[in-house]
From Swiss-Prot:
Disulfide-bonded cysteines: none
Swiss-Prot/TrEMBL keywords: Chaperone, Cytoplasm, Ribosome biogenesis, rRNA processing
Chief subcellular location: cytoplasm
UniProt keyword Cytoplasm present: yes
Protein name (record): Ribosome maturation factor RimM
PANTHER family for the chain: RIBOSOME MATURATION FACTOR RIMM
Organism field: Thermotoga petrophila (strain ATCC BAA-488 / DSM 13995 / JCM 10881 / RKU-1)
Domain PRC barrel: residue ranges: 104-176
Comment text on domains: The PRC barrel domain binds ribosomal protein uS19.
Subunit note: Binds ribosomal protein uS19.
SUPFAM superfamilies: PRC-barrel domain (SSF50346), Translation proteins (SSF50447)
Gene, per the UniProt record: rimM
Amino acid sequence: MIRTIQDLLNERVAIGKIVNTHGLKGEVKFFPYTNSEEIVKNLSSVVLYNSEKKAFYNLTVESVRRMNKLFLIRFKSIDTIEAAERIKGCEVFIKYEELPKLSEDEYYFYEILDCDVFYESGENVGKVVDIIETGSNDVLVVRKKKKETLIPMTKDCIVEIDKGAKKIIAKEMEWI
């Protein structure tokens, strides 16, 4: 049973946020953090967390359907707009093991964020604080003290990713 935010983060990953209500019968608008429609369409049992109220809600998903860039979700125990209003702003969490398995060269953002990044020489570049999606490839935002370094997630720039050790080895690039 999840009692603290630390329990939640140890067992589950946030996949999106409830941004608004939809209609009068308890449906909610869901903004996904993932571009995998499969994850959202297969939701069954989720934990919602409201950071302002420090409240957890264990809910069962009844239905999911797409609406433009959002999804509409109906939960079994939420059947009025008033009940839906109470979960507005909550992040939606699923168990890590419910995420689809990835090939070795793929990753989830949560696996890369907070990784320590080193150049091949051993120099510590910093920690991954953000990932920018550019369309062609992702770019790591690595911060050490107040200095930020951008490192493209390409085979030319990344030598090794050790997700278990939270460590990335990158080539030191000389920019022209």
